Amino acid sequence: MIKLLYPEFWQKRNIIAYLLLPISLIYQFLGYLRASLARPIMLPAKVICVGNCSVGGTGKTQIVMYLAKLLKARNVSFVIVTKAYGSNLKSATTIHQGHTALEAGDEGVILAKYGAVIATKSIKEIVPLINELKPDTIIVDDFLQNPYFHKDFTIVSVDSQRLFGNGFLIPAGPLRQYPNKVLDAADLIFLVSSHQDKIPNILTPYVNKLINAQIVPANNIDKTKNYFAFSGIGNPERFFATLKNYGLNITGYKIFPDHYNYLQADLENLYSLAKEHNATLVTTRKDHVKFNDLNNNIVCLDVELSINNPDLLNEKIFKKAQIFN
């Protein structure tokens, strides 16, 4: 898998974005061809699909965690299906908490705390495992653009700062799909890390299905120390902003590509940088799980989702067509 940082021209158009537009048109055509030829299968349970329109972190994992806790509280049996990013998986596998990030992907390891998880690179491969587990509901993480399975309920996650970037498709921009059609079809839209009262203009037509959400710290960290922060996630800027908003003194940063698999040399370099800054290393849970027993001196900031209108979420999920009754 190609691992890229989020380039500046994905947010603000420049000559590079325009030069890449012909490739974006090819990407668009291939996506259309794929969707038109697909024959979606019906999975043997009701499906909640969580995804986004663009590349980069938009809070999908935290939404999936929130949904898992919500369904568990309602005694609804469920399985989480996640892409095996950064793993060496060859086929769909049921994940347990003993798996490493290399075996299951960073998201698979994290989500295994919340319920049964299947990590896969192909939706069709999960059917035998779903038949074994027999859940009432399947929470599918990050397969929104996959046309090969039926979705009963879709949630689109939107980052409140990046929104839809420069409006171009990959690689000229960050978009996997143009947003209007996706937002029209969505059952719910999460505007993540939104601390603003004003709704972005592009989302005002969807206010009746819009949920404002924040990514907030879920554990206590010593605020008297200095910290050197690093991450290899889709939206590192949001992580760094969360650290500052939490009140930590951040003396330096280092950004790695999304789903980066750290080497021993990376760890040694990070410890050296932290020593230069008289600081302790701090990172995300997605990064932390990749260090196994080597991470004893690295502080991890756990985060969770906080939403302003949970009643809307409950109403939409549990009442729409009574799909979970």
UniProtKB/Swiss-Prot annotation:
Q: What is this protein called?
A: Tetraacyldisaccharide 4'-kinase
Pathway field: Glycolipid biosynthesis; lipid IV(A) biosynthesis; lipid IV(A) from (3R)-3-hydroxytetradecanoyl-[acyl-carrier-protein] and UDP-N-acetyl-alpha-D-glucosamine: step 6/6
Which GO-annotated molecular functions does the record name? ATP binding; tetraacyldisaccharide 4'-kinase activity
What keywords appear on the UniProt entry? ATP-binding, Kinase, Lipid A biosynthesis, Lipid biosynthesis, Lipid metabolism, Nucleotide-binding, Transferase
Its EC number(s): 2.7.1.130
For the ligand (ATP), the binding residues are: 54-61
User: Which InterPro entries is this protein grouped with?
Assistant: LpxK, P-loop_NTPase
Q: From what superkingdom does this record's organism come?
A: Bacteria
Starting at the broadest rank, the lineage of the source organism is: Bacteria, Pseudomonadati, Pseudomonadota, Alphaproteobacteria, Rickettsiales
UniProt GO BP: lipid A biosynthetic process; lipopolysaccharide core region biosynthetic process
- Which SUPFAM superfamilies does the record cross-reference, listed alphabetically? P-loop containing nucleoside triphosphate hydrolases
- What family, per the record? Belongs to the LpxK family.
What PANTHER family does this protein's entry cite? Answer: TETRAACYLDISACCHARIDE 4'-KINASE, TETRAACYLDISACCHARIDE 4'-KINASE, MITOCHONDRIAL-RELATED
